[in-house]
Amino acid sequence: MVKVLGLVAILLIVLAGNVLSYDRQGTRKNLVIHPTNEDDPTFPDQVHISLVGPDKMRISWITQSSISPSVVYGTVSGKYEGSANGTSSSYHYLLIYRSGQINDVVIGPLKPNTVYYYKCGGPSSTQEFSFRTPPSKFPIKFAVSGDLGTSEWSKSTLEHVSKWDYDVFILPGDLSYANMYQPLWDTFGRLVQPLASQRPWMVTHGNHELEKIPILHSNPFTAYNKRWRMPFEESGSSSNLYYSFNVYGVHIIMLGSYTDFEPGSEQYQWLENNLKKIDRKTTPWVVAVVHAPWYNSNEAHQGEKESVEMKESMETLLYKARVDLVFAGHVHAYERFSRVYQDKFDKCGPVYINIGDGGNLEGLATKYRDPNPEISLFREASFGHGQLVVENATHARWEWHRNDDDVSVEKDSVWLTSLLADSSCKI
């Protein structure tokens, strides 16, 4: 049956026009990860957590049979003074796949910088997990990596990230690379569970989450929206495809490259209102995240609508709001730009960083444009991850760590000053 599903998926990819037009190198094989306990259909599988408002956490997991979605939690292992109930759902994809029961439970209020122990499904569950909430003071530490996938390189990246004591993981789109072959979503959930069950993972979608097939499956983002529910309602958004959240001192805006972004569209109006509501006294740093990069000197993905037209539509909004950083994925390489606005250096513009280098099966985008544009300060086609440490209201440090023969090597680093600290860039 698995072979049949694989052949169907390959055929559908071709029919959908999802054929790459440039060479990829440095691939490693994809992983297949089975459930930890296949004998127990109620055993929690693919556990991950995400932030919900200032003091709550969403616990998400999958079971193979129907259960009452509930979570018990507490600050001492084995002692659970808190409990909460949630919702469950599932989905079909074509006629050949049905997901397990996807459970979502929001717990809280929670204390900052505190370890909580929890069980999915109630106190009788045999598996205990734990997570730590983000702190309520600086420094704040973000791990960043996009285009992750389920390859051996993906596993290597996650192993490097796990050795760093970060607070929140940010993924700028292209999660599982299921490409319509739904069992890869399950493998992805199991691959990231050791990290995603311990720290909040905040994600946005990419082109590989679309999974739309004319006539056969007309509803895009089915798996993504069901499996990775983000706090969109809490930020006034009407769609799981774009939202915002706060971690102490930092406002983060997760934008949708593959949904409406034209002036006057719902996302545009939401972004406009969201930016107006930012209190720079309490959140002096503002970070935006997209999938398709607005600046890119790699040969890959040049001239795509989602990059060019979204930039034309929204760049000025971010510039006028003095957004400090913009992360993107899509291009399977690393690149850091200077502060930019309208294709030129501008000290009041955001720093743009492309980090679609998580390790997916497609490999690396190794061809760069020559000569190197002046605004591109560092570029390298290697897998890896980034570390953003917001030290205080005015300064942050960015590091990019390359996966080098399975050893994490720091290759690029820079100190950043908040635009709020520059008197000439005052809003």
From Swiss-Prot:
Homodimer. Its EC number is 3.1.3.2. It catalyses: a phosphate monoester + H2O = an alcohol + phosphate. Pfam families: Metallophos (PF00149), Metallophos_C (PF14008), Pur_ac_phosph_N (PF16656). The active site is at H301. Zn(2+) binds at D174, N207, H291, H330. Fe cation binds at D147, D174, Y177, H332. Substrate binds at N207, H330, V331, H332. GO terms for cellular component: extracellular region. CDD domains: MPP_PAPs. This is Probable purple acid phosphatase 20. Glycans are attached at N85, N392. Residues 1-21 form the signal peptide. Keywords: Glycoprotein, Hydrolase, Iron, Metal-binding, Secreted, Signal, Zinc. Its cofactor is Fe cation; Zn(2+). Gene3D superfamilies: 3.60.21.10, Purple acid phosphatase-like, N-terminal.
